[in-house]
Structures are given as structure tokens and as C-alpha cells.
């Protein structure tokens, strides 16, 4: 069964993103939200790309925009807040990294 990983913190401040990558499986999904959006510019992002296929990598667009983060839509998919709620409700298992 796949897991939804909600990453709310920056790897520049905590080890939560590294811990997430240590346990992630190939069929899991990662969503960057809140300060987790900063992980797009962290070295660990390349590790995330090597473990998870693009269709399962998301960022909450409103949270990235609020932090003036440029989104390369070839490297990550965007979610609206409504789409995030739909994804959470449709997923049986999730963990929040915060």
C-alpha cells in the first residue's frame, strides 16, 4: 500500500525531509507544503527525484507562491489547496513530516 508523505518543514532547518527520504518507497507520494516548499532548492531534492517518479511529486502552489519560490513544472506537479484535500481524503495512509 502506498503512503502519502506531507512534508511541512525545510531541510535547511530540520532533518524531517531526510528522514522522509530514508523510509520512502517507490510507489509513495510526496507533497511539499508550508516551509517544505523550500526543499525544492535543497540538495536532498535530487535524492527525492531519484526515489520517486514525477507523477508522485507535488507542491502546494499557493504555499510556494507565498514564499516566492519558482516552480519548474517539469520537475514537480502543482496542487491547489482543494486538490490537496482531495488527495488526502483519497489516500488511505499518510504521514506528516513537521
Give the ranges of each region predicted by the language model.
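Short, glycine-rich nucleotide/cofactor-binding loops
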Residues: 3-16, 34-40
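Extended, well-folded catalytic/binding cores that form a central cleft or groove in large enzyme
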Residues: 19, 56-59, 87
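Short, conserved loop/helix-junction motifs that constitute active-site signature segments
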Residues: 22-26, 47-54
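N-terminal beta-loop-helix "entrance" segment that forms/cooperates
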Residues: 38-49
Amino acid at each position: 500500500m502506498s503512503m502519502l508523505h506531507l512534508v511541512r518543514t525545510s531541510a535547511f532547518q530540520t532533518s524531517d525531509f531526510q528522514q522522509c527520504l530514508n523510509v520512502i518507497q517507490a510507489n509513495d507520494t510526496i507533497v511539499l507544503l508550508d516551509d517544505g516548499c523550500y526543499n525544492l532548492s535543497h540538495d536532498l531534492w535530487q535524492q527525492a527525484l531519484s526515489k520517486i517518479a514525477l507523477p508522485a511529486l507535488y507542491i502546494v502552489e499557493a504555499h510556494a507562491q507565498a514564499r516566492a519560490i519558482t516552480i519548474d513544472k517539469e520537475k514537480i506537479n502543482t496542487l491547489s489547496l482543494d486538490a490537496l484535500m482531495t488527495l488526502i481524503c483519497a489516500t488511505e495512509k499518510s504521514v506528516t513530516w513537521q
